[in-house]
Structure formats: structure tokens, C-alpha cells
Amino acid sequence: MVVVGGGKAVREIELNNANKNPALEHWDSLQIMTENAIALMSHFEGTTMASTPFKKASGLFFLDAFQYCKNDKTINGEPFLPQTRDVRSDSVALRFAQDFEFSALYLLKSVNFPASKNWEDACNQNYVDRFFYKLFNNKKHNPTIYTINLRSSQTVQPFNSSNKV
């Protein structure tokens, strides 16, 4: 499953909106992630756009982040992930991996992993979005998380990332 980020288009929304409407910014960002996934999918044969319900199968799947988050609700019917700028592609990817009990999650980044002792520290250094560590620490078991810097050769499993820190 590939969860594509929003990139520069989301950064522009963040700069232009400056907390005017956090929920709208959140959903616009998810829509951009989905549009980026569709664009990236066009470069691969035999890919599938996925949302929920999702059935694990072999193949290359791209997540429709907007639709997945729209369908991902708490018992009270509220969206599972907060509708704020604290939630971006990192948290969406982790939530999907938790939801479908994936054993591993690979975060593809454009910077090296910072000198961090846990995910909260990595959030504070803007390596992952601000909700990531809260989502991570809310689960007893998580996928093993690897980070890969696409602009260098760094591939790491930062810490025992499959359990709460």
C-alpha cells in the first residue's frame, strides 16, 4: 500500500490558510494526497486505488486518503483522525497500517532521520506530522517502522518502533 503525501501543494495551503479553517485545510490536504496518488499510479501498470473496505492481496495499491479518512470513524461516528493540520500523510499511513494490522510501515522521506529518542521527539523536530506520536503511543502494538531518505542512502529502523516508547 502506497500512501502518497501532499507535498508542495499542501505546504501552500498551510501558508495561505494560516488556521482560518483547520477542518477544511485537513480535507483539502487529503484530497491533494489522493490526486497525487492518482498521478503517481499512472506511471505503474496494474495498480489499484484502495480505500475501505480493504482486503489484503498481492499487488500495488495506492491509498485514496480522502475516502479512507472519510470512512474511518470512531464508535461515535466522528472521524478517527483529528481534522487539523497536525494530521498529514505520516499519520494517515500509520492509521491505515494499524487498522489493517500491517507488520511493517516504510516512511519515504526527503531528509535523514533526526537524532531522536522516540516518535514524540521526531514530531517535535518536524520529521513526521504532529499527531503521529499520539497515534503511535495509543496502540499497544504497531507495525515496525522504517524510514528511508529518498535523497540519500539512509534506511533506518529508528528504535524498537513496533512497541510504545
Tell what function each PLM region has.
Residues 84, 91, 119-165:
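Polyanion-binding loop/helix "lid" in catalytic or ligand-binding cores
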Residues 67-70, 92, 110-113, 150-152:
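Short acidic/polar capping segments at secondary-structure boundaries
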Residues 13-100, 123-124:
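Ligand-binding beta-strand-loop-alpha-helix segment within the catalytic cores
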Residues 99-117, 148:
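Glycine-rich phosphate/pyrophosphate-binding loops
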Residues 47, 100-102, 138-144:
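Structural alpha-beta junctions
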Residues 8-12, 113-115, 152-155:
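Short, active-site-adjacent cap segments at secondary-structure transitions
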Residues 1, 60-64, 106:
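Structural motif
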Residues 2-8:
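Glycine-rich beta-strand-to-loop/alpha-helix junction loops that act as flexible
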